[in-house]
Regions:
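Short, high-confidence coil segments that cap the C-terminus of an alpha-helix
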Residues: 41, 104-108, 212, 264-269
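Conserved acetyl-CoA-binding loop-helix of GNAT-fold acetyltransferases
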Residues: 81, 86-102, 248-260
């Protein structure tokens, strides 16, 4: 197992994924890996007796604000072992080496990821523990049939009136700079991510695309909230990828305003992924979102005392799928 700069082995790594019928990795590599390496990330590879890459794992840093301090999490992603070598011991050695190398560098406080069932079994034996469960939540905001859509619209209008729903301004992502929402605003005890343009470009293919919209709220002349939505797609489904807000703003107030805004764009359902055990998920549910069956474990291991504090505070995580490998 060797730590490498993935940019120096780009074609070999891409070929490993293509051979495993994961061609979507190639454009992701092209748009995400240079920024990941520049931020301090890297890859680990394993080779066969002929020197060909047959295993790969990457880890990229993600900055968070946790109460009054900054912490850095390492997002492990793109783990793959070629089929002839797909057994417990090679995968265990790869994950163990990557974790220990990351610990030795001293740049990150914890490492986290959302593995599939088989990878989780290996990670459990590498010192990773389950922090919680990433769960999908869906908010019905409309319907293609007017006889169903009309009552839904009346419900959202009523909820907005009762909650004092915010009037959000829609801004095409292609014409809007989200720099003012890069840092978590205000003071909060929660774990909240920093975001930058490179993360949006990496996570959302084609960003800023025609379907990418920021819905913003200003109070006292400053940006109080920004919500990033992609969609709706042809089925009417839109994704809520980022919630950047002053901690004093109730999520329900923002969502009631957002529901009315996305209805105007023929959205029928709005979905978001977050940690089910968190206070943020409680706010999501109280805003009208309904949990669905889709879920995935989120596991992590601490590298520093600050990282240990983060892992013991699952209820304080305020993340979405934008912050995970999901």
């Amino acid at each position: 197992m060797t730590a490498v700069n993935p940019l120096d082995h780009a074609e070999e790594i891409k070929q490993l994924f293509v051979a495993d019928e994961r061609p979507e990795f190639v454009p992701f590599f092209d748009r995400a890996y240079a920024a990941g390496v520049q931020a301090g990330g890297g890859s680990w590879v394993g080779r066969d007796s002929d020197g060909h890459i047959v295993m790969h794992l990457a880890c990229f840093p993600r900055r968070f604000r946790f109460g009054e301090r900054d912490v850095v999490g390492g997002l492990m992603r793109d783990a793959l072992v070629a089929r002839p070598y797909r057994s417990f011991f090679p995968a265990h050695a790869l994950i163990k080496r990557a974790t220990e190398d990351t610990r030795a560098l001293g740049r990150m406080d914890f490492v986290y990821t959302n593995p599939n069932r088989h990878a989780k079994a290996v990670m459990d034996l590498c010192g990773f523990a389950q922090v919680g469960t990433l769960e999908r939540y869906v908010l019905p905001v409309g319907h293609r049939r007017w006889i169903v859509d009309r009552p839904i619209g009346l419900v959202h209008a009523g909820v907005r009136w009762v909650r004092g729903g915010a009037t959000l301004v829609p801004r095409a992502a292609s014409e809007f700079s989200a720099v003012e929402f890069a840092s978590p605003p205000g003071d909060s005890p929660r774990l909240r991510p920093y975001h930058n343009a490179a993360q949006y470009l990496a996570r959302l293919e084609g960003y800023p695309a025609a379907a990418d919209w920021w819905f913003t709220l200003k109070e006292n002349g400053a940006g109080a909230a920004g919500l990033l939505v992609r969609g709706p797609d042809s089925s009417g489904l839109a994704d809520l990828y980022a919630v950047r807000r002053d901690p004093r703003l109730p999520l329900a107030r923002l969502i009631s305003g957002l529901a009315v805004a996305v209805r105007a764009n023929r959205c029928t359902r709005l979905q978001v992924w977050t940690l089910a055990e968190s206070l943020f998920a409680t706010e999501v549910r109280r805003s009208g979102f309904v949990p669905r069956q889709e879920a995935a474990p989120l596991v992590a291991t601490a590298l520093t005392p600050s990282g240990q504090a983060v892992l013991h505070a699952a209820h304080l995580w305020e993340i979405t799928s934008l912050d995970c490998d999901h």
